[in-house]
Amino acid sequence: MKFFATIAALVVGAVAAPVAEAEAEASSPMLIERAGPGGINYVQNYNGNLGQFTYNENAGTYSMYWNNGVNGDFVVGLGWSTGAARSITYSSNYQASGGSYLSVYGWINSPQAEYYIVESYGSYNPCGAGQSGVTQLGTVCSDGATYTVYTDTRTNQPSITGTSTFKQYWSVRQTKRTSGTVTTGNHFAYWAKYGFGNSYNFQVMPVEAFSGTGSASVTVS
């Protein structure tokens, strides 16, 4: 998981910076034997021990509580071993302070890229004003709202294949929400104008946090 450097600098109490090893992240999730609703077949559990992570893959539900603060970065949730331009329906009770996201998250194999469709977040807008090295690409109107689109290049950073240079693509919902449907294809089509490919690696609907406290109970299909 990568965060813009200016956000990392703002996070009080973070160890080094809230940058997780993406390669370890990719190896941490596990395939599940029986698919849940919507074909869910993937459990994302990166540093779930930083809080209390529980899940029921057959029901498409998970919960995470991090009420003692976060000393590091975690990414936990449910999704698919192979991404697609799918519509993802979710509902949640998501409450977070500090640095946290509720998003659709995944990777593209070639050209390698990491992506977020951020539905809600805690105190820090991941692409807020003043972020260095970030290029705004306009807006996408999708699912009844406007998302601001950004890109960023990560140079010699941890990725799903080790250390590499890759792009990040972000769509951040201008009005936060905690339930609804995300039509990922609308974002992918817009990002494709700027080099986003369609060689999908995993795709999940996780909660992520690298500071503060919070809780999330999420249903995904």
Swiss-Prot record:
Swiss-Prot/TrEMBL catalytic activity: Endohydrolysis of (1->4)-beta-D-xylosidic linkages in xylans
Compartment(s): Secreted
Triggers of expression: Expressed in cultures grown in medium containing D-xylose or oat spelt xylan. Transcription is completely repressed in the presence of glucose.
Enzymatic class: hydrolase
TM segment ranges: none
Extent of the signal sequence: 1-16
Any one Gene Ontology cellular component term annotated for this protein: extracellular region
The keyword Secreted is assigned to this record: yes
GO terms, molecular function: endo-1,4-beta-xylanase activity
Domain GH11 as annotated: residue spans: 29-221
Pathway per the UniProt entry: Glycan degradation; xylan degradation
Active site: 114 (nucleophile), 208 (proton donor)
Keyword terms of this UniProt record: Carbohydrate metabolism, Glycosidase, Hydrolase, Polysaccharide degradation, Secreted, Signal, Xylan degradation
Aminoacyl-tRNA synthetase is among the record's keywords: no
Biological processes per GO annotation: xylan catabolic process
EC number, as in UniProt: 3.2.1.8
Protein task: Endo-1,4-beta-xylanase involved in the hydrolysis of xylan, a major structural heterogeneous polysaccharide found in plant biomass representing the second most abundant polysaccharide in the biosphere, after cellulose.
Family recorded in the similarity comment: Belongs to the glycosyl hydrolase 11 (cellulase G) family.
The name this protein goes by in its record: Endo-1,4-beta-xylanase A
Name of the encoding gene: xynA
